[in-house]
Amino acid sequence: MDNARPAIYHLSVIFEKLLNNVMVRLTCGRPKSFDKEIALEKALDVFWTQGYDGASLKDLTQAMGINKPSMYATFGNKEQLYFQAVEMYKNREGAPFFSALEQPQIRDVIETIFSRTAEAKCSNEKNKGCLMIQSSLACSDESSVVKISALKMRAEFIQLIQNRFERAANDGQLVQNADIQVMTHYAVTMLDGLQIHSIDSPPPEMLESVAKIAAEHLFQFCLPLSSQ
Protein backbone atom coordinates (compact mmCIF):
# COMPACT_ATOMS: atom_id res chain seq x y z
CA MET A 1 0.00 0.00 0.00
CA ASP A 2 2.90 2.36 0.86
CA ASN A 3 4.51 1.66 -2.53
CA ALA A 4 1.25 2.56 -4.29
CA ARG A 5 1.03 6.03 -2.75
CA PRO A 6 4.00 7.53 -4.61
CA ALA A 7 2.62 6.29 -7.93
CA ILE A 8 -0.81 7.81 -7.24
CA TYR A 9 0.83 11.00 -6.07
CA HIS A 10 2.94 11.30 -9.23
CA LEU A 11 -0.12 10.68 -11.40
CA SER A 12 -2.03 13.43 -9.62
CA VAL A 13 0.88 15.84 -10.11
CA ILE A 14 1.09 15.02 -13.81
CA PHE A 15 -2.68 15.44 -14.19
CA GLU A 16 -2.57 18.79 -12.41
CA LYS A 17 0.20 20.04 -14.72
CA LEU A 18 -1.72 18.93 -17.79
CA LEU A 19 -4.84 20.68 -16.52
CA ASN A 20 -2.90 23.87 -15.86
CA ASN A 21 -1.44 23.81 -19.39
CA VAL A 22 -4.90 23.43 -20.88
CA MET A 23 -6.24 26.34 -18.83
CA VAL A 24 -3.31 28.55 -19.85
CA ARG A 25 -3.92 27.80 -23.52
CA LEU A 26 -7.63 28.48 -23.19
CA THR A 27 -6.93 31.77 -21.42
CA CYS A 28 -4.39 32.89 -24.02
CA GLY A 29 -6.73 32.03 -26.87
CA ARG A 30 -9.68 33.82 -25.34
CA PRO A 31 -10.33 37.17 -27.05
CA LYS A 32 -10.04 40.25 -24.90
CA SER A 33 -13.25 42.09 -24.17
CA PHE A 34 -13.79 45.21 -26.27
CA ASP A 35 -16.47 47.68 -27.24
CA LYS A 36 -17.93 46.44 -30.51
CA GLU A 37 -19.25 49.84 -31.58
CA ILE A 38 -15.94 51.60 -30.95
CA ALA A 39 -14.07 48.87 -32.82
CA LEU A 40 -16.47 49.19 -35.76
CA GLU A 41 -16.02 52.96 -35.72
CA LYS A 42 -12.24 52.48 -35.96
CA ALA A 43 -12.70 50.08 -38.86
CA LEU A 44 -14.93 52.61 -40.62
CA ASP A 45 -12.22 55.24 -40.26
CA VAL A 46 -9.66 52.89 -41.87
CA PHE A 47 -11.96 52.01 -44.79
CA TRP A 48 -12.89 55.67 -45.22
CA THR A 49 -9.28 56.84 -45.23
CA GLN A 50 -7.60 54.00 -47.13
CA GLY A 51 -10.42 52.55 -49.22
CA TYR A 52 -11.55 48.93 -49.21
CA ASP A 53 -8.61 47.54 -51.16
CA GLY A 54 -6.10 49.72 -49.33
CA ALA A 55 -7.25 48.59 -45.88
CA SER A 56 -5.27 45.50 -44.88
CA LEU A 57 -6.33 43.14 -42.10
CA LYS A 58 -3.30 44.34 -40.14
CA ASP A 59 -4.41 47.97 -40.51
CA LEU A 60 -7.93 47.09 -39.45
CA THR A 61 -7.12 44.94 -36.43
CA GLN A 62 -4.49 47.39 -35.17
CA ALA A 63 -6.93 50.29 -35.41
CA MET A 64 -9.69 48.24 -33.77
CA GLY A 65 -7.40 47.04 -30.99
CA ILE A 66 -8.23 43.36 -31.50
CA ASN A 67 -6.63 40.30 -33.07
CA LYS A 68 -7.77 38.53 -36.23
CA PRO A 69 -9.63 35.68 -34.47
CA SER A 70 -11.62 38.25 -32.47
CA MET A 71 -12.42 40.19 -35.63
CA TYR A 72 -13.63 37.09 -37.47
CA ALA A 73 -15.64 35.90 -34.45
CA THR A 74 -17.35 39.27 -33.97
CA PHE A 75 -17.65 40.81 -37.43
CA GLY A 76 -16.88 38.04 -39.93
CA ASN A 77 -14.39 38.47 -42.77
CA LYS A 78 -13.12 41.76 -44.21
CA GLU A 79 -16.04 42.10 -46.62
CA GLN A 80 -18.61 41.52 -43.87
CA LEU A 81 -16.81 44.00 -41.63
CA TYR A 82 -16.90 46.57 -44.42
CA PHE A 83 -20.65 46.26 -44.91
CA GLN A 84 -21.25 46.70 -41.18
CA ALA A 85 -19.03 49.79 -41.27
CA VAL A 86 -21.01 51.10 -44.25
CA GLU A 87 -24.25 50.66 -42.31
CA MET A 88 -22.77 52.74 -39.48
CA TYR A 89 -21.65 55.35 -42.03
CA LYS A 90 -25.10 55.46 -43.59
CA ASN A 91 -26.85 55.91 -40.24
CA ARG A 92 -24.49 58.60 -38.99
CA GLU A 93 -23.62 60.58 -42.09
CA GLY A 94 -27.02 60.15 -43.72
CA ALA A 95 -29.18 61.18 -40.77
CA PRO A 96 -28.95 64.97 -41.40
CA PHE A 97 -29.66 64.41 -45.09
CA PHE A 98 -32.70 62.20 -44.49
CA SER A 99 -34.19 64.63 -41.98
CA ALA A 100 -33.65 67.53 -44.39
CA LEU A 101 -35.74 65.80 -47.06
CA GLU A 102 -38.71 65.72 -44.69
CA GLN A 103 -39.06 69.51 -44.56
CA PRO A 104 -42.31 70.67 -46.20
CA GLN A 105 -40.83 73.44 -48.38
CA ILE A 106 -38.45 72.45 -51.19
CA ARG A 107 -36.48 75.68 -50.79
CA ASP A 108 -35.71 74.70 -47.20
CA VAL A 109 -34.78 71.19 -48.33
CA ILE A 110 -32.31 72.51 -50.90
CA GLU A 111 -30.75 75.05 -48.56
CA THR A 112 -30.43 72.53 -45.73
CA ILE A 113 -28.85 69.65 -47.65
CA PHE A 114 -26.20 71.94 -49.10
CA SER A 115 -25.46 73.85 -45.90
CA ARG A 116 -25.31 70.66 -43.83
CA THR A 117 -22.98 69.00 -46.33
CA ALA A 118 -20.60 71.97 -46.16
CA GLU A 119 -20.82 72.16 -42.37
CA ALA A 120 -20.17 68.43 -41.96
CA LYS A 121 -17.07 68.57 -44.12
CA CYS A 122 -15.80 71.69 -42.37
CA SER A 123 -16.29 70.17 -38.92
CA ASN A 124 -14.22 67.04 -39.59
CA GLU A 125 -10.64 67.24 -38.33
CA LYS A 126 -9.52 65.02 -41.19
CA ASN A 127 -11.63 65.41 -44.31
CA LYS A 128 -12.03 62.07 -46.05
CA GLY A 129 -14.60 62.86 -48.72
CA CYS A 130 -17.47 60.46 -49.36
CA LEU A 131 -17.02 56.78 -48.52
CA MET A 132 -19.45 55.68 -51.24
CA ILE A 133 -17.77 57.71 -53.97
CA GLN A 134 -14.36 56.38 -53.01
CA SER A 135 -15.62 52.80 -52.80
CA SER A 136 -17.23 52.96 -56.23
CA LEU A 137 -14.14 54.46 -57.88
CA ALA A 138 -11.22 52.78 -56.13
CA CYS A 139 -12.15 49.09 -56.02
CA SER A 140 -10.39 46.37 -57.98
CA ASP A 141 -12.17 43.66 -59.95
CA GLU A 142 -11.62 41.31 -56.99
CA SER A 143 -13.74 43.67 -54.88
CA SER A 144 -16.63 43.88 -57.35
CA VAL A 145 -19.21 43.07 -54.65
CA VAL A 146 -18.10 46.13 -52.69
CA LYS A 147 -18.17 48.33 -55.79
CA ILE A 148 -21.63 47.12 -56.83
CA SER A 149 -22.93 47.78 -53.31
CA ALA A 150 -21.50 51.32 -53.34
CA LEU A 151 -23.03 52.04 -56.74
CA LYS A 152 -26.38 50.71 -55.52
CA MET A 153 -26.31 53.00 -52.48
CA ARG A 154 -25.46 55.98 -54.67
CA ALA A 155 -28.34 55.12 -56.99
CA GLU A 156 -30.67 55.05 -53.98
CA PHE A 157 -29.32 58.43 -52.86
CA ILE A 158 -29.98 59.93 -56.30
CA GLN A 159 -33.48 58.45 -56.36
CA LEU A 160 -34.29 59.98 -52.97
CA ILE A 161 -33.42 63.44 -54.28
CA GLN A 162 -35.41 62.92 -57.47
CA ASN A 163 -38.42 61.68 -55.49
CA ARG A 164 -38.28 64.80 -53.33
CA PHE A 165 -38.21 67.10 -56.36
CA GLU A 166 -41.13 65.18 -57.89
CA ARG A 167 -43.07 65.61 -54.67
CA ALA A 168 -42.33 69.35 -54.74
CA ALA A 169 -43.60 69.53 -58.33
CA ASN A 170 -46.82 67.75 -57.34
CA ASP A 171 -47.24 70.20 -54.45
CA GLY A 172 -46.94 73.16 -56.83
CA GLN A 173 -43.61 74.34 -55.42
CA LEU A 174 -41.65 74.25 -58.70
CA VAL A 175 -41.96 76.38 -61.82
CA GLN A 176 -43.96 74.91 -64.66
CA ASN A 177 -42.03 72.45 -66.83
CA ALA A 178 -39.10 72.30 -64.37
CA ASP A 179 -36.73 69.57 -65.55
CA ILE A 180 -36.56 67.32 -62.50
CA GLN A 181 -33.90 65.07 -64.03
CA VAL A 182 -31.59 68.03 -64.58
CA MET A 183 -32.31 69.39 -61.10
CA THR A 184 -31.54 66.01 -59.56
CA HIS A 185 -28.25 65.48 -61.35
CA TYR A 186 -27.18 69.06 -60.77
CA ALA A 187 -27.80 68.65 -57.03
CA VAL A 188 -25.93 65.33 -56.92
CA THR A 189 -23.00 66.72 -58.93
CA MET A 190 -22.63 69.72 -56.63
CA LEU A 191 -23.00 67.65 -53.44
CA ASP A 192 -20.40 65.18 -54.71
CA GLY A 193 -18.12 68.06 -55.62
CA LEU A 194 -18.34 69.55 -52.14
CA GLN A 195 -17.40 66.24 -50.55
CA ILE A 196 -14.54 65.51 -52.93
CA HIS A 197 -13.15 69.05 -52.70
CA SER A 198 -13.23 68.88 -48.90
CA ILE A 199 -10.31 66.42 -49.08
CA ASP A 200 -8.13 69.38 -50.12
CA SER A 201 -9.10 71.14 -46.85
CA PRO A 202 -10.23 74.46 -48.36
CA PRO A 203 -11.22 77.26 -45.96
CA PRO A 204 -14.61 76.49 -44.36
CA GLU A 205 -16.07 79.77 -45.58
CA MET A 206 -15.14 78.78 -49.15
CA LEU A 207 -17.08 75.51 -48.97
CA GLU A 208 -20.03 77.30 -47.38
CA SER A 209 -20.03 79.94 -50.15
CA VAL A 210 -19.93 77.28 -52.86
CA ALA A 211 -22.81 75.43 -51.17
CA LYS A 212 -24.83 78.65 -51.04
CA ILE A 213 -24.27 79.39 -54.74
CA ALA A 214 -25.25 75.82 -55.67
CA ALA A 215 -28.48 76.12 -53.70
CA GLU A 216 -29.28 79.49 -55.30
CA HIS A 217 -28.96 77.98 -58.77
CA LEU A 218 -31.64 75.44 -57.86
CA PHE A 219 -33.87 78.15 -56.41
CA GLN A 220 -34.54 79.38 -59.96
CA PHE A 221 -36.70 76.28 -60.44
CA CYS A 222 -38.64 76.96 -57.23
CA LEU A 223 -41.66 79.19 -56.93
CA PRO A 224 -41.55 81.81 -54.16
CA LEU A 225 -43.78 81.01 -51.20
CA SER A 226 -46.13 83.88 -52.13
CA SER A 227 -46.84 82.24 -55.50
CA GLN A 228 -47.70 78.80 -54.14
Q: Where in the sequence are the language-model features?
A:
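C-terminal peripheral helix-coil segments that are non-catalytic and often amphipathic
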Residues: 2-26, 114-119, 155-159, 163-167, ...
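Helix-turn-helix
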Residues: 24, 38, 46-80, 84
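Generic hydrophobic, amphipathic alpha-helix propensity
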Residues: 35-44, 60, 85-89, 93, ...
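Hydrophobic alpha-helical connector segments
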Residues: 84, 98-128, 180-187
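Amphipathic alpha-helical packing segments from all-alpha helical-bundle domains
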Residues: 104, 108, 144-170, 182
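Amphipathic alpha-helical segments used for helix-helix packing
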Residues: 110, 124-145
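Hydrophobic alpha-helical segments that form the core
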Residues: 128, 133, 178-197, 210-217
